[in-house]
Amino acid sequence: MQGTFRDFLKPRTVDIQEQGERRAKIVLEPLERGFGHTLGNALRRVLLSSMPGSAVVQAEIEGVEHEYSSMEGVQEDVVDILLNLKSLAVRMHDRDEAELTVSVQGPGPVTAGDIQTAHDVEVKNPELLICTLTKAVAFNAKLMVARGRGYEAATQRDGDEDRVIGRLQLDASYSPVKRVAYTVESARVEQRTNLDKLVLDVETNGVLEPEEAVRFAAGLLRDQLSVFVDLEGGEFEAEQEEQEPDVDPILLRPIDELELTVRSANCLKAESIHYVGDLVQRTEVELLKTPNLGKKSLTEIKETLASHGLSLGMRLENWPPAGLGEDRVVG
């Protein structure tokens, strides 16, 4: 085989251009010709269809038996209220479902900011309008929020025979990504002018930052494609054995660069965990045995790793890489 994948250009520049509070453009260059569309289309599909998140899956509204009921003193129809609830942006920490309540006395608007939540549940768009009370009436509701991935129709969760009158089932769009578009522009490196520049335009609901969403999607693609790298046979395998295995650069980053709280960082260093690669190989059980590191710190660590497409309990075949030990601090 003439040449290897190392002959291909590898992107050197990643530029994040903020377009608003929840929207950003991520620019990647230079890419070999054609790779802009190859990577852009793959990332777009993953961002739109496979991102995990939370959504309202069920609502119980006082005085309402079904979505076609009428409510005295409420400007919106029940169908419109349910549509508004589907746009609720919720982030849950270390749990798979939660029950939220809302109780408002009219007249006036009912917004997502009126929802009462537990300490480990956040509403990221408190300005969202749920309904408008035109009279001095009360609006009381219970909302069930669940964690999932992609899109799930209400009919996929329960059959008609299992439904209780008054419990309104909602189709759930769990993805925190609202919109993704990409363009491929021309790039140049020295005398080469036939290269690609990929521009991803990503908008989220605020639960994840756009760059976090792209990082997660890229990590998911990498994980899915890694099985092909292990295929046996041919010169490819021989060449891989001749050279030292590549290590994901993020694993080489010191713990301090994760921007954890001082308490969490010090607890990890006390256990000789100085690099991200050291951390991801530990399990939750192992970390909870660390002195002064509680569940709150563990949750912070898990969320920080997830934002980088990583998790606890990972297996690293080539860790630590050669040369890293020279800089490691003995705790």
Curated annotation (Swiss-Prot):
Know the name of this protein?
Answer: DNA-directed RNA polymerase subunit alpha
- Relate the protein's function as given in its record: DNA-dependent RNA polymerase catalyzes the transcription of DNA into RNA using the four ribonucleoside triphosphates as substrates.
Question: Which portions of the sequence form the region Alpha N-terminal domain (alpha-NTD)?
Answer: 1-232
Task: Work out whether the entry's keyword set contains Transferase.
Answer: yes
Q: What is the lineage of its organism?
A: Bacteria, Pseudomonadati, Pseudomonadota, Gammaproteobacteria, Chromatiales
Q: Where is this region: Alpha C-terminal domain (alpha-CTD)?
A: 247-331
| Entry similarity comment | Belongs to the RNA polymerase alpha chain family.
Entry GO MF terms? DNA binding; DNA-directed RNA polymerase activity; protein dimerization activity
From the UniProt record, list the reaction(s) this protein catalyses: RNA(n) + a ribonucleoside 5'-triphosphate = RNA(n+1) + diphosphate
Q: Among the record's GO biological process terms, what is one?
A: DNA-templated transcription
Q: What is known of its domains?
A: The N-terminal domain is essential for RNAP assembly and basal transcription, whereas the C-terminal domain is involved in interaction with transcriptional regulators and with upstream promoter elements.
Q: What keywords does the record list, in alphabetical order?
A: DNA-directed RNA polymerase, Nucleotidyltransferase, Transcription, Transferase
Cite the record's note on assembly. Answer: Homodimer. The RNAP catalytic core consists of 2 alpha, 1 beta, 1 beta' and 1 omega subunit. When a sigma factor is associated with the core the holoenzyme is formed, which can initiate transcription.
What would be one Gene Ontology cellular-component term for the protein?
Answer: cytoplasm
EC number assigned by the record = 2.7.7.6
**Organism annotation:** Alkalilimnicola ehrlichii (strain ATCC BAA-1101 / DSM 17681 / MLHE-1)
Q: Name one Pfam family in it.
A: RNA_pol_A_CTD
